[in-house]
């Protein structure tokens, strides 16, 4: 059940015809009311999917996860492919597509980019509302002709990233990717809207040092931390090197060199 804190009270409502039953299911699953006259947010069932809408006169537009159309789809088609800085940061090279755990998945945008480039992705999102939006977006994208094969490479886990990483079973990821919540300075309207919506629900990641420590213990090859370009490194072990962009920076914590799969298979034979 989600704790209803001051300034972040949420109700669930159906805007789509016939969506009342599904709204009731989400409300029960998340422990949220279907009616609350004093709610600050509404988790809304619409014909286009699940969305989060801040309530009030000056509220920004709703946020919904959409991997098929909009900005995410545009980035998939025209974003630069393997030349993108995030691709370089996780170690994508000819013949190398590492398995990646995105332990701060958010709305899944970075994970989708990496999946579209061929990486097998695990995603962790600890905030239940954001995880619900992401789950809904993945479900809708799974049936799409163009992106269904990409979504098939994305596995969503919900819960505390530190706990899930420490209790990880099975083959560990080669790379763990972290983008802890930090005051963003990007000037796009979309980022502003999402940050404005999510900050009351999520706050800053005060446990980022513990998350980095857990990630370093699990990842077999490297940990990558995305930061605003001028932000300090996360407290703890210093990165081996960094990749700087216009607004963001990727701190790289290398453990072992990534190799093409064929070379890895031959060496293990």
UniProtKB/Swiss-Prot annotation:
One of its GO terms (molecular function) is rRNA (guanine-N2-)-methyltransferase activity. Its EC number is 2.1.1.242. It holds the Pfam family SAM_MT. It catalyses: guanosine(1516) in 16S rRNA + S-adenosyl-L-methionine = N(2)-methylguanosine(1516) in 16S rRNA + S-adenosyl-L-homocysteine + H(+). Keywords: Cytoplasm, Methyltransferase, rRNA processing, S-adenosyl-L-methionine, Transferase. Transmembrane segments: none annotated. It is found in: Cytoplasm. S-adenosyl-L-methionine binds at residues 125-126, 179. It is an enzyme of class 2 (transferase). Gene3D superfamilies: Vaccinia Virus protein VP39. InterPro entries: 16SrRNA_methylTrfase_J, SAM-dependent_MTases_sf. Its main location: cytoplasm. GO terms for cellular component: cytoplasm. Belongs to the methyltransferase superfamily. RsmJ family. HAMAP family: 16SrRNA_methyltr_J (MF_01523). Specifically methylates the guanosine in position 1516 of 16S rRNA. This is Ribosomal RNA small subunit methyltransferase J.
């Amino acid at each position: 059940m989600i704790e209803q804190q001051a300034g972040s009270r949420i109700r669930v409502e159906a805007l789509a015809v016939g969506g009342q039953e599904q709204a009731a299911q989400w409300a029960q699953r998340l422990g949220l009311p279907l009616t609350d006259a004093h709610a600050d947010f509404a988790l809304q069932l619409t014909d286009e999917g699940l969305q989060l809408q801040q309530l009030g006169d000056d509220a920004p537009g709703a946020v919904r996860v959409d991997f098929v159309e909009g900005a995410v789809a545009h980035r998939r088609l025209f974003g630069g492919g393997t030349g993108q800085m995030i691709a370089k940061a996780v170690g994508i090279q000819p013949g190398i597509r590492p398995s990646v755990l995105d332990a701060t998945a958010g709305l899944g945008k970075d994970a989708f980019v990496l999946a579209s480039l061929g990486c097998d992705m695990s995603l962790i999102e600890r905030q239940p509302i954001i995880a619900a939006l992401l789950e809904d977006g993945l479900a809708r994208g799974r049936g799409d002709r163009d992106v269904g094969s990409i979504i098939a490479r994305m596995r969503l886990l919900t819960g505390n990233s530190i706990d899930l990483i420490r209790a990880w079973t099975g083959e560990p990821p080669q790379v763990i990717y972290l983008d802890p919540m930090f005051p963003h300075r990007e000037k796009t309207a979309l980022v502003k809207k999402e940050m404005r919506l999510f900050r009351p629900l999520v706050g800053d990641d005060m446990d980022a040092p513990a998350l980095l420590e857990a990630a370093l213990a699990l990842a077999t090859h490297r940990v990558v931390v995305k930061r605003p370009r001028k932000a300090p490194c996360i407290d703890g072990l210093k990165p081996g090197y960094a990749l700087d962009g216009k607004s963001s920076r990727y701190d790289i914590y290398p453990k072992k060199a990534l190799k093409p799969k064929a070379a890895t298979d031959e060496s293990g034979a």
